[in-house]
Amino acid sequence: GSPVFIAFRSSTKKSVQYDDVPEYKDRLNLSENYTLSISNARISDEKRFVCMLVTEDDVFEAPTVVKVFKQPSKPEIVSKAPFLETEQLQKLGDCISRDSYPEGNITWYRNGKVLQPLEGAVVIIFKKQMDPVTQLYTMTSSLEYKTTKADIQTPFTCSITYYGPSGQKTVHSEQAVFDIYYPTEQVTIQVLPPKNAIKEGDNITLKCLGNGNPPPEEFFFYLPGQPEGIRSSNTYTLPNVRRNATGNYKCSLIDKKSLIASTAITVHYLDLSLNPXGELTKQIGDSLPVSCTISAIRNATVVWMKDNIKLRSSPSFSSLQYQDAGNYVCETALQEVEGLKKRESLTLIVEVKPQIKMTKKTDPSGLSKTIICHVEGFPKPAIQWTITGSGSVINQTEESPYINGRYYSKIIISPEENVTLTCAAENQLERTVNSLNVSAISIPEHDEADEISDENREKVNDQAKLIVGIVVGLLLAALVAGVVYWLYMKKSKTASKHVNKDLGNMEENKKLEENNHKTEA
């Protein structure tokens, strides 16, 4: 079109005149040094301007072209695919940058490297659109991409390259990382709990895994001896397994049965048989074979206990004694399998017929004699004291605790004449009777050593003390032998006497001649 005058300044009048041009209204400023400034620049300001100098002689012109630039917005990737599937050409997203002048160029990057179009693998479609009002451009670039597993966690970006007053510039978008879908190429199977710790009664869980993304959610599970698979989620549980569950287990994909995994499972078991078991009653002297039989998938340790004390070897009874009685436990375990142990018990009761031993001892004061009836038997025998001849029962007795099948009953008497005491011990097996002649208190006699109690059985006298005692005893025996014989002969002629007040009145003893035929203990 025709040139339009927009501003004039006279060198003499020092005044500025602006023509009435609507698009430049209030936007022009012509300075004293003839510099023209245009404020609030617009795209329409991009045109050719001419500075004219008019003199009396001539007209001079100096043209210039004004370029207008607008920096675009930072590019961003929109309409992003939720995931990328391998071997599929699909739209990855759009890179968009707005409000640019002039238009810019968009470039796509994979892991920082420029993506170039490649048939069937990389397709880039570029579009630009100008706003009719602002005359600014919006650039859009769509990327179609065939991904591979190598793109897992790989960043994609795009950039806008544009021109400004100082030259070419580039602005990059934020990174975008996509979830890569790929098919399963391998199947694995897991066993919970770990395979080396499975025992009878456990619940086994088979877990099948595929290495695809997303992982498969369903599988076929194959049990030993069953060709048909069981469709299930990625886990399958076998409750309360028995030893016949030992075997090979497999799993495969639903849609590709050739992708299969297998594992061997061993169900550990442990059987224990104790014969005899429970509670058993035997008599002393009996023989008793005992066997503890173990059946296991591998070697197992066997431990015998008696009354919570570990035995060195298996018990064997060719002739039962009372001390063999007790609670026996046979226990076995597989050390490598936690919790796999078995135990059986035998409570052995050894019955013993009552056995009696009687002892007597004179008090050092010489005023009384202690008579003790030592009894061994099981069940615990009842003890009864009587005076031979009169049949009187003695009730004033003192008993020791019943320990290990033994105890004793003790009486203290002061007989005025010779007497015979009877101790009877009775349990459900038998009644046993023993008698002991006791001289009158005035007649010295040989005392018998007390029975050593079980709890003190291991405490024996020192050998030196024993020898000294024997020597002293022999000397004393030689000294009193004559005296004892004289007193005894004298007493044998004496009429019948009465037993000490502690025993009460007793009936008259048999004739002295009959007593003389009894053997004194």
UniProtKB/Swiss-Prot annotation:
This is CD166 antigen. Glycans are attached at N29, N33, N105, N203, N244, N299, N395, N418, N437. InterPro entries: CD80_C2-set, Ig-like_dom, Ig-like_dom_sf, Ig-like_fold, Ig_sub, Ig_sub2, Surface_Rcpt/Adhesion_Mol. It is found in: Cell membrane; Cell projection, Axon; Cell projection, Dendrite. Residues 488-521 are cytoplasmic. It comes from the Eukaryota. It is a single-pass type I membrane protein. Residues 183-266, 271-347, 354-439 form the Ig-like C2-type domain. Residues 500-521 are annotated as: Disordered. GO terms for biological process: adaptive immune response; axon extension involved in axon guidance; cell adhesion; heterophilic cell-cell adhesion via plasma membrane cell adhesion molecules; neuron projection extension; retinal ganglion cell axon guidance. Disulfide bonds join C95-C158, C208-C251, C292-C330, C373-C423. Gene3D superfamilies: Immunoglobulins. Cell adhesion molecule that mediates both heterotypic cell-cell contacts via its interaction with CD6, as well as homotypic cell-cell contacts. Promotes T-cell activation and proliferation via its interactions with CD6. Contributes to the formation and maturation of the immunological synapse via its interactions with CD6. Mediates homotypic interactions with cells that express ALCAM. Mediates attachment of dendritic cells onto endothelial cells via homotypic interaction. Inhibits endothelial cell migration and promotes endothelial tube formation via homotypic interactions. SMART domains: IG, IGc2. GO terms for cellular component: axon; dendrite; immunological synapse; plasma membrane. Glycosylated. Residues 507-521 have a biased composition (Basic and acidic residues). Homodimer. Interacts (via extracellular domain) with CD6 (via extracellular domain). Homodimerization and interaction with CD6 involve the same region and cannot occur simultaneously. The affinity for CD6 is much higher than the affinity for self-association. Interacts (via glycosylated extracellular domain) with LGALS1 and LGALS3. Interaction with LGALS1 or LGALS3 inhibits interaction with CD6.
